[in-house]
């Protein structure tokens, strides 16, 4: 019986050793699986956080773009209103007392640009003022001219139009940034 007992003890020891070894391997497998799961979880969390941050950046960028678009629209609207006010003023400037001086300068500049001028065309409402300002050149009515003159040469084939509204049109693009800046202040 002692041999049986000895064999049984030895078998029991071997079983315990195998069980312990299996438990150790199982614990290692579980630990490795937990580590891989944690690594995967951390990786997914980083990915989600990066996606969240990217979404926030996109949302901020979209909001900034929308804000800038609104500012630009407001600025353009303000510039348009300023130009409309100036055009309204220029439309009424012909009735101002100082308009004779303005028309005189417009005529002089036109004559300098076209030295061989045959005629000066002005709006019919400005004929009397223009006749007093011009000598040596025919003064004609031209209803399409408003707030200025058209100096004509070579039978009307060449000439220059010098009006206040024309001058405004020429400087609009250059003045828009300055007007926008002033409106923003």
From Swiss-Prot:
Q: What is the lineage of its organism?
A: Bacteria, Thermotogati, Deinococcota, Deinococci, Deinococcales
Quote the gene name from the UniProt entry: atpE
Q: Which organism is it from?
A: Deinococcus radiodurans (strain ATCC 13939 / DSM 20539 / JCM 16871 / CCUG 27074 / LMG 4051 / NBRC 15346 / NCIMB 9279 / VKM B-1422 / R1)
Q: What is this protein called?
A: V-type ATP synthase subunit E
**Protein origin, superkingdom:** Bacteria
Q: Name one GO cellular component term.
A: proton-transporting two-sector ATPase complex, catalytic domain
List the molecular function annotations (GO) for this entry. Answer: ATP binding; proton-transporting ATP synthase activity, rotational mechanism; proton-transporting ATPase activity, rotational mechanism
Q: Looking at the keywords, is Cell cycle present?
A: no
Gene3D superfamilies to which the protein is assigned, alphabetical:
ATP synthase, E subunit, C-terminal (3.30.2320.30), F1F0 ATP synthase subunit B, membrane domain (1.20.5.620)
| UniProt keyword annotation of Nucleotide-binding present | no
Give the keywords, sorted. ATP synthesis, Hydrogen ion transport, Ion transport, Transport
Q: Which InterPro entries match?
A: ATPase_E_C, ATPase_V1_Esu
Task: Please give a single GO biological process term from the UniProt record.
Answer: proton motive force-driven plasma membrane ATP synthesis
Family membership, please give it. Answer: Belongs to the V-ATPase E subunit family.
Purpose of the protein: Produces ATP from ADP in the presence of a proton gradient across the membrane.
């Amino acid at each position: 019986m002692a041999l049986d007992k000895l064999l049984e003890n030895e078998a029991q020891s071997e079983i315990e050793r195998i069980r312990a070894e299996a438990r150790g391997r199982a614990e290692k497998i579980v630990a490795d699986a937990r580590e891989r799961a944690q690594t995967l979880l951390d990786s997914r969390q980083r990915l989600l956080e990066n996606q969240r941050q990217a979404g926030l950046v996109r949302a901020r960028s979209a909001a900034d773009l929308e804000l800038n678009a609104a500012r630009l629209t407001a600025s353009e609207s303000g510039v348009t209103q300023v130009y409309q006010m100036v055009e309204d003023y220029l439309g009424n400037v012909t009735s101002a007392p100082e308009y004779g001086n303005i028309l005189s300068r417009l005529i002089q500049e036109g004559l300098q640009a076209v030295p061989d001028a045959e005629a000066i065309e002005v709006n019919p409402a400005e004929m009397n003022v223009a006749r007093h300002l011009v000598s040596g050149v025919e003064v004609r009515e031209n209803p399409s001219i408003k707030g200025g003159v058209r100096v004509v040469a070579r039978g009307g084939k060449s000439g220059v139009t010098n009006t206040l509204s024309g001058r405004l049109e020429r400087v609009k693009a250059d003045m828009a940034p300055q007007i926008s800046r002033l409106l923003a202040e």
